[in-house]
Amino acid sequence: MTDENIRQIAFYGKGGIGKSTTSQNTLAAMAEMGQRIMIVGCDPKADSTRLMLHAKAQTTVLHLAAERGAVEDLELEEVMLTGFRGVKCVESGGPEPGVGCAGRGIITAINFLEENGAYQDLDFVSYDVLGDVVCGGFAMPIREGKAQEIYIVTSGEMMAMYAANNIARGILKYAHSGGVRLGGLICNSRKTDREAELIENLAERLNTQMIHFVPRDNIVQHAELRRMTVNEYAPDSNQGQEYRALAKKIINNDKLTIPTPIEMDELEALLIEYGILDDDTKHAEIIGKPANAK
């Protein structure tokens, strides 16, 4: 069973936004502060723990279960490894592409962990979830009442904001039945114009906060090449301090809200206001015309 005092958080975000990197660097900083943490990777890529373990990809619960015949045939020690600063690491894994539902695998893995005592002596459990759109499968940690506190990693790019709004819509769907709340937007900067201001504006419309603006810094890539978090690779770096600042904000966060997702027209108007998207009315005469059109 799960200790009621454990805070169960989840990081969602568009594919390629830097969600797994941001979450691992933040959780490493939280572990430095004495928080007892378990990461449950819910992405079929199984890359949610690699910086903690200095590994390419951790063997997943579903992969081992398929080898053995059933998840009941596994031992906890086979699927739960210990990484940087004692962080417990598990990857749920996913089915073969085009076969089955990843969400079913996620909940199978979580139930196995709960039944085998993995949730004892922890302060935080963090679910790292694929989430361009919160489909039924990847919403499983929310639907099943596991993840209670959601952080959306986004940026000032159109598709990242579009995904953030969709994820907010998924949270709203289960907010009243399951008690899940939005903890905030994390802006993982892509250096777009007026990016912090734009995400602050989006956060306000979604009835949440931009909990932190993470600046872009090549030291993140240098650390990733070594399969390390920034906090381990360059603990005194400015970027390491940014992740520590975000970690503190999450630990102390009491602004957990029911989101108010916006309509596509409002999102487009916001993007036009900040110059991310061109106003159709300005270019009505060229919309839909090929390059060779006169």
Swiss-Prot record:
GO MF term set: 4 iron, 4 sulfur cluster binding; ATP binding; metal ion binding; nitrogenase activity
Chain residues that bind ATP: 13-20
The entry's keywords: 4Fe-4S, ADP-ribosylation, ATP-binding, Iron, Iron-sulfur, Metal-binding, Nitrogen fixation, Nucleotide-binding, Oxidoreductase
Pfam families in UniProt: Fer4_NifH
Catalytic activity from the UniProt record: N2 + 8 reduced [2Fe-2S]-[ferredoxin] + 16 ATP + 16 H2O = H2 + 8 oxidized [2Fe-2S]-[ferredoxin] + 2 NH4(+) + 16 ADP + 16 phosphate + 6 H(+)
Cofactor stoichiometry and binding remark: Binds 1 [4Fe-4S] cluster per dimer.
E.C. numbers: 1.18.6.1
Biological processes per GO annotation: nitrogen fixation
Post-translational modification: The reversible ADP-ribosylation of Arg-104 inactivates the nitrogenase reductase and regulates nitrogenase activity.
Sites where the protein binds [4Fe-4S] cluster: 101, 135
HAMAP family the UniProt entry points to: NifH
Subunit structure: Homodimer.
PANTHER family reported in the protein's UniProt record: LIGHT-INDEPENDENT PROTOCHLOROPHYLLIDE REDUCTASE IRON-SULFUR ATP-BINDING PROTEIN
Membership in a protein family: Belongs to the NifH/BchL/ChlL family.
Name this protein carries in UniProt: Nitrogenase iron protein
Species of provenance: Anabaena sp. (strain L31)
Gene designation per UniProt: nifH
